[in-house]
Amino acid sequence: MEPKRIREGYLVKKGSVFNTWKPMWVVLLEDGIEFYKKKSDNNPKGMIPLKGSTLTSPCQDFGKRMFVLKITTTKQQDHFFQAAYLEERDAWVRDIKKAIKCIEGGQKFARKSTRRSIRLPETIDLGALYLSMKDPEKGIKELNLEKDKKVFNHCFTGSGVIDWLVSNKLVRNRQEGLMISASLLSEGYLQPASDLSKNAADGIAENPFLDNPDAFYYFPDSGFFCEENSSDDDIILKEEFRGIIIKQGCLLKQGHRRKNWKVRKFILREDPAYLHYYDPAGGEDPLGAIHLRGCVVTSVESNPDGKKSDEENLFEIITADEVHYYMQAATAKERTEWIKAIQVASRTGK
């Protein structure tokens, strides 16, 4: 019998010979991980056996490169993968850990259908805690805070985090809250925003997290940005990033000039509605932005050149300025999710 496919999708993989990062189509099986240059390829470029392997997450071997996980095989070979965003990395980590555990116990991989309890166990589930903190009704309130002639948008204070943990009886005292907050910071669930919090996170203070009203933090997908004395051009540019992130992930995008298809990381924001796309293996600056206000988005069954495509799950965005963009999702379900999310965003704000 063929090993069962547990999870598949685009991740950015570090080359084993050269220090290059490239997007790959990654398939998690019950006994290993296969990775392909393209989703449509039949033969994998490589396979990582999971038996006896160990998983490290978060992996902070690469400085600013976030959402990285490391798999070390029994032959002490390290394999590094980078997800597009935090929840995606956590989903891969959960399934890989479970697959390794099933191999060790001689069991078949099976997902539990029981709903996850929101009440945190003694061993704190940081992923569940993070989701509770982000709850629009009962979570930590995101604020616009001012310090040293700068305005920090969509953030909160270190003491505010501890207050929230204590008031929700998730910790017994502020000292315990400090330990949990430091763990959230090291796992990437919280990010330092102000100079004070950044210096502490870099090891200048005794504790990486500060129970301090002047230490500012933010959620990694919150739409955080900082304003200071800046030119009109900077303000216009920042306007694009004010919106709250409502969806992100990797898609194939067709280039406008060469018409070739490349994997791009997309971040969808609403109010104002923008879809930014990035090189998934590259830096923090977007390669481009699609203004979605008043756009039309539809699924298409053929390539832009009119030929019937072998590739499935294509969709098209036509902006208000009549610029056409073509993308390809990995599955029909994913295409539907993106189309619906873009339609919602296109009706909001500016």
UniProtKB/Swiss-Prot annotation:
GO biological process: actin cytoskeleton organization; cell projection organization; cortical actin cytoskeleton organization; hematopoietic progenitor cell differentiation; integrin-mediated signaling pathway; intracellular signal transduction; negative regulation of G protein-coupled receptor signaling pathway; negative regulation of inositol phosphate biosynthetic process
Listed InterPro entries: DEP_dom (IPR000591), PH-like_dom_sf (IPR011993), PH_domain (IPR001849), Pleckstrin (IPR037370), PLEK_DEP (IPR037371), WH-like_DNA-bd_sf (IPR036388), WH_DNA-bd_sf (IPR036390)
A GO term for molecular function: protein kinase C binding
Chain positions found as Phosphoserine: 113, 117
Residues modified to N6-acetyllysine: 64
Domain DEP: 136-221
Keywords of this entry: Acetylation, Phosphoprotein, Repeat
Function in brief: Major protein kinase C substrate of platelets.
Name listed for the protein in its UniProt record: Pleckstrin
Species of origin: Rattus norvegicus (Rat)
Gene name of the record: Plek
